[in-house]
Regions:
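N-terminal cap/lid segment of alpha/beta-hydrolase-fold proteins
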Residues: 2-28, 230
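Conserved HGGG/HGGXW glycine-rich cap/lid loop of the alpha/beta-hydrolase fold
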Residues: 18-76
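Conserved acidic catalytic loop of the alpha/beta-hydrolase fold
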Residues: 86-104
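Conserved hydrolase catalytic core segment
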Residues: 102-141
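A catalytic-pocket lid/entrance helix-loop region that shapes and gates access to the active site
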Residues: 125-178
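Conserved alpha/beta-hydrolase "acid-adjacent" motif
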Residues: 241, 266-272
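Short beta-strand/loop motif that positions the catalytic acidic residue
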Residues: 252-253, 259-261
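Catalytic active-site module of serine/aspartate enzymes centered on a nucleophile-bearing elbow/loop
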Residues: 283-323
Length: 323
């Protein structure tokens, strides 16, 4: 069982001004001469942390992490202005150009897999390979499953807490009801809705209860950004065309991909990964038997660390023992 690499500090930090009012936080760690990899975080609105750097051998990889618009250390916090998928794709290209990188590996989980796929399909010539976890295709049925009916039947106790801020007469369209509160002027109602939204995700993210994950999702600062930005994206169908990611998978058919997905992922059910793998013959699908959605689960963590080592071995032409 592979574990995370030891915690490391960035060797460079950047504040990158993009379209107003946004300033992105970007950092670099590992080897400045290593294989560039971009860690694409989830949410949207989740942000990066010290854990984000630890899936990669710092002697082999130049590790780039960034907080997407409105979250983490990027500013302004929880802003929805000029915040769409197209903006985030443009930001990734801006970061690549700013750092002088020709091509890089994309490493993304959950919404990070969505954004990685969308970017790779827009700029396939800039991508070496993709390592994806917890695939989220952002189809209408995917939103309905987690935010209207589906996961609710597996976790009725957690679901009751999730819908508590919404009066019964508005529960026919929960995403719209949450959006009204998350974008409203009543700050108490906004925070109540944000905590309920974020905690629902945190409590269902792992196969076995994990208080550390729940506590991270319950953090007030994080919850506000994630709930507002996620809801903003999801009521707009992630600013993607219908079935866009599967429709355009031919654009990355030549790229290698490793897909890691938990068998019991309730947030992004396994059929997301299965459909992507079926459409992308150059991908490898690893189904983790005893895991849900979170990258912190042992089986998923092991598979991701191994995947990063395998991609480095292939691209750097290393003997197996060095990767």
């Amino acid at each position: 069982m592979q574990t995370l690499y030891p915690e490391i500090k960035p060797y460079a930090r950047h504040e990158l001004a993009v379209e107003a009012p946004h300033v992105l936080y970007v950092d670099e760690s590992g080897s400045p001469e290593g294989l560039p990899v971009l860690f694409v975080h989830g949410g949207p609105g989740g942000g990066c942390d010290a854990l984000s750097r630890r899936f990669f051998d710092p002697n082999l990889y130049r590790i780039i992490t960034f907080d997407q618009r409105g979250c983490g250390r990027s500013t302004p916090h929880a802003s929805l202005e000029n915040n769409t998928t197209a903006h985030l794709i443009a930001d990734m290209e801006h970061i690549r150009d700013f750092l002088g990188i020709d091509k890089w590996v994309l490493f993304g989980g959950s919404w990070g897999s969505t954004l990685s796929l969308a970017y790779a399909q827009a700029f396939p010539e800039r991508v070496h390979a993709l390592i994806l976890r917890g695939i989220f295709l952002c189809r209408p049925e995917d939103f309905h499953w987690f935010y209207q009916e589906g996961a609710s039947r597996l976790f009725p106790d957690y679901w009751q807490d999730f819908i508590a801020p919404i009066p019964p007469e508005e529960r026919g369209d929960l995403m719209q009801a949450f959006y009204k509160r998350l974008t409203g002027t009543d700050q108490i109602a906004q925070m109540h809705a944000a905590k309920a939204w974020s905690c629902w995700e945190g409590r269902t993210a792992t196969l076995r209860p994990n208080t550390q994950v729940v506590d991270r999702f319950s953090d007030t600062h994080r919850a506000l950004a994630m709930a507002r930005i996620e809801c903003h994206y999801f009521v707009n169908q992630a600013f993607l065309e219908p079935n866009q990611l599967l429709r355009d998978v031919h654009k990355i058919a030549h790229l290698p991909g490793i897909i890691v997905h938990g068998r019991y992922d309730v947030i992004c059910p396994l059929d997301n990964a299965w459909a992507l793998h079926e459409a992308w013959p150059n991908s490898e699908l690893q189904i983790i038997r005893e895991a849900g959605h979170s990258a912190s689960e042992h089986g998923i963590c092991d598979a991701l660390v191994r995947a990063a080592a395998e991609i480095a071995q292939r691209l750097l032409d290393l003997p197996p023992e060095e990767a």
